[in-house]
Every structure is written in structure tokens, then in C-alpha cells.
Regions:
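Short C-terminal tail/terminal secondary-structure segment
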Residues: 122, 202, 213-234
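Short, small/polar-rich loop/turn modules that mediate ligand/substrate recognition or access, typified
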Residues: 63, 149, 154, 212-214
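Residue(s) in the substrate-gating loop at a strand-loop-helix junction
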Residues: 117
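Active-site helix of classical SDR
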Residues: 97, 133, 141
Length: 234
């Protein structure tokens, strides 16, 4: 997004993560703006959005990317743990979306990108709250489009597949069962790379997507296209 000309503003509840992000971007020669923010706090969101639009620029593009996951079987999960995930992963985008959309409505344009997941479509053991939130985010994306498309605001989602990141590095090794599973389960035959998401994000943030609304683009190497195949099948 920065390479395409966007001014980057990053929010996080953890100041140390913001400092790390600022350094990472600075090492690439990119200046970013950072603000400490809890996306589940509606009053704080309203104050921070107003501050950003005063200190930086009106927000033309919003990427809802905050998220947490708790890997707990349903029978062992407490209701409060379930609510915590929904609060960040679903209520957070709702609060951020409606707060930023007010200005977009006044200006008559805007782009909102909600980071969904393959779990918007599929279930998996121990991630019931995350899957419920991401499934809800898919439908929230469609409802935002239903209400705001008339104001020339495009609201779409991106559903990443399994990506090669620092977090997945420990299991992305030859011989690891999950690594072998992902490679065989993905028609593209590999893990996604961070740069694989860039084109989709830039497209959804640009005028090229002005008539695309309420869609979730799955960047997953084809996982959702197939039931998969037995391990002994070529």
C-alpha cells in the first residue's frame, strides 16, 4: 500500500508493537504514523479517528486487521473467552467501520477492507470463536456494502490462506506433518508469501475496484476450490 502511494497509519493496543512496526517501515525508507488504540473501545475509536483525520489526513482507506485467536475445544471454552475473540475480531471492525464510514459518507467516497479468513467458510478443531467471528465478518462486509454502496464506498474482504510468516516458521520445515498437509492440501503446492496479498489489497483500495462491493477475495492458493486428495494420490 505504501509503495502504491498510500499514507500509512497503524493502530495497536500494544505500544511496543507500534515501535517495532515503525522501525521495520523506517528500514525500508517508509514513514508511518502510529496511534495506540483498542478497537473494542468505541469512545477511544471515535477520539482517535478524529485525531488521525486532524493530524494526518481524512481516512480514505480503512483496513480492519486487528484480531486474536484462542485455540480451545468448544466443551472446554468459557463464554468469556468466546466473547473476547468476538469482541476483537467482529465488534472491532464494526466499531472502526462505522466510525470511519461517517467521514467517508460526507466526502462521498471510501474503501474499507475487512481481513477475513478461510475460517469465514471452513471450520477447524479448537477455533470455534475465531471461525464464528470471521464468518460474521464476511456477513458484516456484505451488510456494510448494502448500506454504504450508495455513498460510493466499497467494502470488501480478503481471506488469506496459510502464509509463510515468522509465526508459522517453526512448522514450515520438511517432515513436519502440518507442513506436508498444507503443501498437499493447497493446489498451488506451497505456502503463501506476504507479497501474494499485496496485489489484492492494492486492487481493493484503488479505483479499479469502484464497482466491486460486498465480496471476499480468498488468497489461498486454491484451498477453498477443492475437497483435497488422499495422501497416496498423485
Amino acid at each position: 500500500m505504501a509503495n502504491a502511494g498510500a499514507t500509512i497509519v497503524i493502530n495497536d493496543v500494544f505500544p511496543d508493537k507500534l515501535e517495532a512496526a515503525k522501525k521495520e517501515y523506517a528500514d525500508k525508507g517508509i514513514h508511518i504514523h502510529t496511534y495506540v488504540l483498542d478497537v473494542t473501545d468505541e469512545a477511544a475509536v471515535e477520539q482517535t479517528v478524529a485525531l488521525i483525520e486532524k493530524e494526518v489526513n481524512p481516512i480514505d482507506i480503512l483496513v480492519n486487521n486487528a484480531g486474536i485467536i484462542k485455540r480451545i475445544p468448544i466443551l472446554e471454552m468459557k463464554a468469556e473467552e468466546f466473547r473476547q475473540v468476538l469482541d476483537v475480531d467482529l465488534t472491532g471492525p464494526f466499531i472502526m467501520g462505522k466510525t470511519v464510514a461517517r467521514g467517508m459518507v460526507e466526502r462521498g467516497q471510501g474503501k474499507i477492507i475487512n481481513m477475513c479468513s478461510m475460517m469465514s467458510e471452513l471450520g477447524r478443531n479448537t477455533v470455534s470463536a475465531y471461525a464464528a467471528a470471521k464468518g460474521g465478518l464476511k456477513m458484516l462486509t456484505r451488510n456494510m456494502a448494502t448500506e454504504w454502496a450508495r455513498h460510493n464506498i466499497q467494502i470488501n474482504g480478503i481471506g488469506p490462506g496459510y502464509f509463510a510468516t515468522a509465526q508459522t516458521a517453526p512448522i514450515r520445515v520438511d517432515g513436519h506433518p502440518f507442513n506436508e498437509f498444507i503443501i498437499s492440501r493447497t493446489p498451488a503446492g506451497r505456502w503463501g508469501r506476504p507479497e501474494d496479498l499485496a496485489g489484492t489489497a492494492v486492487f481493493l483500495a484503488s479505483k479499479a475496484s469502484d464497482f466491486v462491493n460486498g465480496q471476499v477475495v480468498y488468497v489461498d492458493g486454491g484451498i477453498l476450490a477443492t475437497i483435497g486428495k488422499p495422501s497416496n494420490e498423485k
